[in-house]
């Protein structure tokens, strides 16, 4: 792999694409579970992003996270929703968290 960076997690070091917005665990899932070579549909990913933003707002109201944390999550969600970031969600649709 050219143009990579080294990421570290509890399982050790791993090379991931330099521009990737994900880390070692996602790369391990991609490498270890090439089941269907189909990615999660963009509509599902967008719905999940909206759910994460809503959860952040609720958790701010419930004082489970700070306002700054909630704002950061909502801002990140808005960036993901308005840009073209689907390449950064590479895990196979049938990989179910076992990686």
Where are these regions (language model features)?
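Conserved, well-structured ligand/cofactor-binding cores
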Residues: 1-98
């Amino acid at each position: 792999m050219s143009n990579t960076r080294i990421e570290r997690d509890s399982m050790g070091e791993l090379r991931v694409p330099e521009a990737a917005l994900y880390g070692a665990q996602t790369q391990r899932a991609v490498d270890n579970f090439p089941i269907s070579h189909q990615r999660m549909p963009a509509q599902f990913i967008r719905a999940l992003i909206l759910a994460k933003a809503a959860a952040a707002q609720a958790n701010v109201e419930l004082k489970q996270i700070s306002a700054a944390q909630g704002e950061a999550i909502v801002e990140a969600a808005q960036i993901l929703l308005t840009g073209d970031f689907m390449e950064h969600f590479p895990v196979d649709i049938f990989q179910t968290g076992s990686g």
